[in-house]
Amino acid sequence: MYTYMEYLQKCFYKSTNWNEDNIYSNITATSQALLDFPIPNGFKIDSSSKTTDYSASSFTLSNHHQINGSLAYLYSSIPLTNTMGTKDVSLQDAIAGFRIIEPSVGLSSKLTNNIIQNRSSLLYGRMYFPGSALEAMIIKRITKNSQLLIKCVNNPHLEKNGTMIVYLQNNTAKYSRELIYSTNEALIGLRCLYNLGNDATSHNFPHVNPAVIPKFDNSVISIGTELWYAARTMSPGLSAALRYSTRSTSTGKPLTMTLAINPIVGHISSTYTVKTSVASTFCSKYDFNVFSYASNLSLGFELYSYANKKKNTFPSFEHHEIYSSSEENKYLKKHPELQRHHRVPIKSHKYQGNRTIINPIQNLDNVYHINPTLLSSTTNSPTNNDNSNTSETVTAAFQNLVNESDFSSVFKFSTSLNDKVVKILWEGRLKDFLVSTGVKLSLNPITNTPEFNKLGISFSYAL
């Protein structure tokens, strides 16, 4: 679960149209959210308030080993009007989970002029007690595609009482580049990420027979690398990663595959993540070292539950002009009286007068039945007669259904076969609070008995 300050930072990025998924450090963010999610340790309570559209404050208190806490402040040069408190915020925005990667869309001229004129910036600071530890962050937009990010930590337990990291980032639709400097070990880094893919697959085939249009659209291949050099110790660093994201036009379900390589230490990591339904996601990760031949398999999933479990409010595509999903069909078979007004036909998508089939499927059920008549180029097709409304693609409807779903909680589970670790996490809404509780279990290598590594609960409240 994001802290309130992290949530405001993401809202700031959305307001300024900054694509976080286009940054190299986030290339494996989806698998990390499903496999490496943090477990609360002890008791923690977080109370936050956005006093104005430009500023917010947060107070945190916990009892991990001892009573400690922190006080944080945040200021934004642009109004953060797209934020919500814990009572109204959707769990999709408050909890790290599956990220649907799609081609970036350029800024509108109105928003671009506004951003360039204001030179948007964000200031953040946090003070910890007891003790004298401080942390700060500055985000300064230089142009519409570049920004300066500075992170500082002051702690008497660190070497030279602290460290500072400076990021100079350039983020466009096709690529992103980062130049990084850290005072720790005089570390210098360079990160690059390039996107290979089409912004709109269907628009690139206006003169091609619709029958041969690929069954996947919005596919994006991202290739990135990072280079590091520690000047003080003269130590190099290198890694490369690849991410493939796509969404099936038959079901609308997205999937993401990644491959990360560190040639210096010989480590290879591959992940496969798929959103199996609107409320569930599955992820697998395989690690292998070419030098030691050590390997590890990690599995994880997340399962959302709906806030209202009444049968008449079962989530459906009835407001989206596509056919029902398999889960809805199971429900409709038990209630035949609802089938009459439930389904609506798939309408063809028109592009410059040439009909392009987005999803040539009719009678979508647990078994898909392809309708060859939809693949015909005949202009007298029944699907062309009704042009009163513009239907959306299955991929867009699935994404909209995920965004519009009212979830009350999410259950996360992950395990690692080689490490013999099990993590269980529950996050949800309790009255006006967001609650996160979980446990981390591991197998004692000597006694072969399970033992608790972490166990805790945290409450978050924000106005």
From Swiss-Prot:
**One Pfam family, short name:** MDM10
Q: Which UniProt keywords apply?
A: Membrane, Mitochondrion, Mitochondrion outer membrane, Transmembrane, Transmembrane beta strand
- A single GO BP: mitochondrial outer membrane translocase complex assembly
Keyword field contains NADP: no
Any one cellular-component term (Gene Ontology): SAM complex
Membrane topology, record value: Multi-pass membrane protein
Q: Which InterPro entries does the entry link to?
A: Mdm10
UniProt entry tagged with the keyword Thylakoid: no
Primary site of residence: mitochondrion
Q: Localized where?
A: Mitochondrion outer membrane
Q: What is known of its domains?
A: Lacks alpha-helical transmembrane segments, suggesting that it resides in the membrane via beta-sheet conformations similar to those predicted for other outer membrane proteins and porin.
Q: Which family does it belong to?
A: Belongs to the MDM10 family.
Subunit and partners: Component of the ER-mitochondria encounter structure (ERMES) or MDM complex, composed of MMM1, MDM10, MDM12 and MDM34. Associates with the mitochondrial outer membrane sorting assembly machinery SAM(core) complex.
PANTHER family tied to this protein: MITOCHONDRIAL DISTRIBUTION AND MORPHOLOGY PROTEIN 10
Its biological purpose is as follows: Component of the ERMES/MDM complex, which serves as a molecular tether to connect the endoplasmic reticulum and mitochondria. Components of this complex are involved in the control of mitochondrial shape and protein biogenesis and may function in phospholipid exchange. MDM10 is involved in the late assembly steps of the general translocase of the mitochondrial outer membrane (TOM complex). Functions in the TOM40-specific route of the assembly of outer membrane beta-barrel proteins, including the association of TOM40 with the receptor TOM22 and small TOM proteins.
What protein name applies here? Mitochondrial distribution and morphology protein 10
The gene from which this protein is expressed is MDM10
